[in-house]
């Protein structure tokens, strides 16, 4: 296999080495994997402590530093498998799952070679090979569920090199942070995240799924181009005559349980996956452990810029759960009955968009409003389906990162091949209190910004989950009043800007809903 450009970009972040135009495990690592694959009667890997010893050996063979692991992570493997789960569960994991994972890892080199052989032909010639998909690089990676399982097995055994990942704005991908002893000793949410992932490994070892998952970096270009939608400025939003889409309000339930075909919003960190592989269990982290295939994107997707979003199609859900934050608990097996599309991806579409953290009063500044509405728009909009209602300024400039003409061409190429896939006219957006909670955003402001972005993108509806937030109790009343006024995207945008100006100048302390109803009634 030739050392292709896509493979070259990611090879230093993989545990394999290139040798005589092939990908291989170092001999000593392959020997360890073969030994463990034969089961605990031969390998003696029958406890968390024994597993930690073999992880240490394999990492030494890969020349990986012990100091790169999270503090006391290997002790954490011992604690979890020897103390936190039952003897029966532990015996099954070491007797069945661990050997199967090692057999899967032994196939990783050949799986990757087959992946690259097909990568240029699956999507009508659009490149879809595993590669570093960096900032301002519109593009897609299409992986089989089997290949994802093997990559996540590498994470479980902590085999990924950590060196230089931060230089490319990549998070750590090994599971050592999950097993970090100081966190897990007193943290039930930590052990429940691990239980979700252990359950996933058990499922795929009993029956390997045969579908595919795509990871797409979507870009809203910052420079003007006559043939695609670029980053709108304030005047563009103010001049929009697009009607507002319909809204369905849900005071209970969860985004991932929505019954329609809709984009399901991941309240993302700018680093895709957030704190999934460490201590947090908020919306993004929970989604990543009940749909573990999302974690694979953390291998090759660096930090998002302000004009970028990440869309993932095809991830399977494996676990049920209850609770949120410190009360999060694994709640057993989940059977995902979503249909498959023509690319054998589940019809689950997750869109990752990161809101501004801790914005304070700064969220009412015009630049912040533009940043947030365009961040949402970059995720919800689809270039090849979008009819331009916004009047763009050809001379528009941006204070953000530049986008080259090559990247602009990638945007067009990246979008065109999905015209045969997405039935965009019927696919709405399922979302909730994006950028609120620990992020500190104003929920009344954020829902309106999302409504604008969803409407302008041509989506037919917004399915909004309030999670019982008291601040949104008057939401239905506001929606009815806006509908009676037959407001457009431009009309609502101008009201948001006017309100935000009054908040900044301390001319009002009302929430946006109360302010808007007063404004419209007079």
UniProtKB/Swiss-Prot annotation:
Gene Ontology MF: a single term: poly(ADP-ribose) glycohydrolase activity
Which reactions appear under catalytic activity for this entry?
Answer: [(1''->2')-ADP-alpha-D-ribose](n) + H2O = [(1''->2')-ADP-alpha-D-ribose](n-1) + ADP-D-ribose
A biological-process GO annotation: regulation of DNA repair
Tell me the gene name: PARG2
Q: Which UniProt keywords apply?
A: Hydrolase
In terms of PANTHER family, this protein maps to: POLY ADP-RIBOSE GLYCOHYDROLASE, POLY(ADP-RIBOSE) GLYCOHYDROLASE 2-RELATED
* Family affiliation: Belongs to the poly(ADP-ribose) glycohydrolase family.
**Top EC class, one word:** hydrolase
Keyword Transport in the entry? The reply is: no
Enzyme Commission numbers on file: 3.2.1.143
Q: Which organism is it from?
A: Arabidopsis thaliana (Mouse-ear cress)
User: Could you tell me what this protein does?
Assistant: Poly(ADP-ribose) synthesized after DNA damage is only present transiently and is rapidly degraded by poly(ADP-ribose) glycohydrolase.
The name of this protein is: Probable poly(ADP-ribose) glycohydrolase 2
């Amino acid at each position: 296999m030739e050392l292709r450009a896509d493979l070259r970009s990611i090879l230093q972040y993989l545990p394999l080495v290139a040798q005589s135009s092939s990908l291989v495990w170092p001999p000593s690592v392959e020997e360890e994997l073969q030994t463990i694959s034969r089961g605990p009667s031969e390998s003696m890997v029958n406890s968390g402590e024994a597993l930690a010893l073999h992880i240490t050996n394999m990492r030494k063979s890969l020349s990986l530093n012990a100091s790169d692991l999270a503090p006391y992570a290997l002790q954490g493997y011992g604690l979890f498998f020897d103390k936190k789960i039952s003897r029966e569960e532990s015996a099954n994991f070491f007797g069945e799952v661990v050997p199967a994972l090692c057999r899967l890892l032994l196939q990783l080199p050949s799986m990757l070679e087959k992946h690259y052989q097909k990568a240029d032909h699956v999507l009508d010639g659009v490149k879809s090979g595993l590669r570093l998909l960096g900032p301002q690089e519109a593009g897609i990676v299409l992986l089989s569920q089997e290949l994802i399982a093997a990559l996540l097995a590498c994470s479980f055994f902590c085999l990924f090199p950590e060196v230089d990942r931060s230089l490319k704005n990549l998070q750590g991908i090994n599971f050592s942070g999950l097993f970090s002893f100081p966190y897990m000793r007193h943290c039930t949410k930590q052990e429940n995240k691990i239980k979700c992932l252990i359950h996933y490994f058990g499922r795929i070892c009993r029956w390997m799924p045969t579908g595919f998952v795509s990871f797409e970096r979507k870009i809203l270009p910052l420079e003007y181009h006559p043939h695609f939608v670029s980053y709108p400025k304030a005047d563009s939003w103010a001049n929009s005559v697009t009607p507002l889409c319909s809204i369905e309000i849900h005071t209970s339930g969860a985004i991932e349980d929505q019954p329609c075909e809709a984009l399901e919003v991941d309240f993302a960190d700018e680093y895709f996956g957030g704190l999934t592989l460490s201590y947090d269990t908020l919306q993004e982290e929970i989604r990543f452990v009940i749909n573990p295939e999302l974690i694979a994107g953390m291998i090759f997707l660096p930090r998002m810029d302000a004009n970028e979003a990440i869309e993932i199609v095809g991830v399977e859900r494996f676990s049920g759960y209850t609770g949120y934050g410190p009360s999060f608990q694994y709640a057993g097996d989940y059977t995902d009955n979503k249909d498959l599309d023509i690319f054998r991806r589940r019809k689950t579409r997750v869109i990752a968009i990161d809101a501004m953290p801790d914005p304070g009063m700064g969220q009412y500044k015009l630049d912040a409003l533009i940043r947030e509405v365009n961040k949402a728009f970059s995720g919800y909009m689809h270039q090849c389906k979008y009819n331009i209602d916004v009047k763009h300024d050809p001379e528009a400039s941006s204070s953000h990162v530049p986008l080259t003409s090559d990247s602009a061409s990638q945007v067009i190429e990246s979008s065109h091949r999905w015209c045969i896939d997405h039935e965009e006219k019927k696919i709405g957006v399922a979302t909730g209190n994006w950028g609120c909670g620990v992020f500190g955003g104003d929920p009344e402001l954020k829902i309106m910004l999302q409504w604008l972005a969803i409407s302008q993108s041509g989506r037919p509806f917004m399915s909004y989950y309030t999670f019982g937030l008291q601040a949104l109790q008057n939401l239905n009343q506001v929606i009815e009043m806006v509908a009676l006024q037959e407001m457009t995207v431009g009309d609502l945008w101008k009201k948001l800007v006017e309100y935000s100006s009054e908040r900044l100048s301390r001319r009002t302390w009302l929430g946006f809903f109360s302010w808007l109803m007063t404004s419209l009634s007079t």
